[in-house]
Curated annotation (Swiss-Prot):
Xref: InterPro entries: ATP_syn_F0_a_bact/chloroplast (IPR045082), ATP_synth_F0_asu (IPR000568), ATP_synth_F0_asu_AS (IPR023011), F0_ATP_A_sf (IPR035908)
Subcellular location: Cell inner membrane
Entries under HAMAP family matching the protein: ATP_synth_a_bact
Major localisation: membrane
Gene Ontology cellular component terms for the protein in this record: plasma membrane; proton-transporting ATP synthase complex
Protein name, as recorded: ATP synthase subunit a
Underlying gene: atpB
A single BP term in Gene Ontology: proton motive force-driven plasma membrane ATP synthesis
Superkingdom field: Bacteria
Membrane-crossing residue ranges in chain numbering: 39-59, 97-117, 139-159, 205-225, 239-259
Lipid bilayer topology: Multi-pass membrane protein
GO molecular function: proton-transporting ATP synthase activity, rotational mechanism
Organism ancestry: Bacteria, Pseudomonadati, Pseudomonadota, Gammaproteobacteria, Legionellales
Amino acid sequence: MYAQPKLTSAEYVQHHMSHWKLNLHNFTFTDGGFWTLNLDTLIISVVLGALFILIFYIVARRATASVPGKWQNAIEMAVEAVDGTVKDSFHGDRSLVAPLALTIFIWVFLMNFMDLVPVDLIPRLFQMGGVEHFKAVPTADPTLTFAMSITVFVLVIFYNFKMKGAIGLGKEVLSRPFGWYLMPINVIFRLIDEGVKPISLALRLFGNLFAGELIFILIALLPWWSQFTLGMVWTLFHLLVITVQAFIFMMLTVVYISLAAESH
């Protein structure tokens, strides 16, 4: 973790917090405002998702009932832990929710884990290929965290309609929490309640990982003799943070779907 000598501290931070952008209007590597695709976020998230699927597939193919290996033990522990958590929170059919929760936890954890990679390593590798900016932590990008939270929001709506039907959901929205006589207020409260969920889900994950990445970058600006000590301390603490944030995102997803699936 070392700073480029030609950059000032402010320029170094700005450089490492900038994305590799694709303008979807003209397909050039420029900022297109709303129509901008962060290629670094897309590449890292897809690669980590593919890695997750590949590892689980290989371990599943080689699974044995006799003497399981280290990878099989680790994956079985993760699957059992997530399934137990889902079982405690979701009391309906878990055939979709449990695999979804496992996928969210592992995928988000892997993306969070990129925050522990030395801040100059991956950007420097891409610079060798002509890419000026590359931000290697997908969950420090609000476009990804909002995309994930909106997907969860869509699932919540789906389960609301599936379990309650259009009429049942309509009655619930119009009559709760203050009764039929205050229908307009009930609708406003429901819109606020549902709208806050994806926003808070996205910003919580983004804020924690963005702050963690920024601290690693600031540590990289310090003298070499202090980088190792502070870097190790922050790495050990941040390892807990990235795990907890992955668990929270998974847990809130399960809770939101469980609340939507409850039949009243």
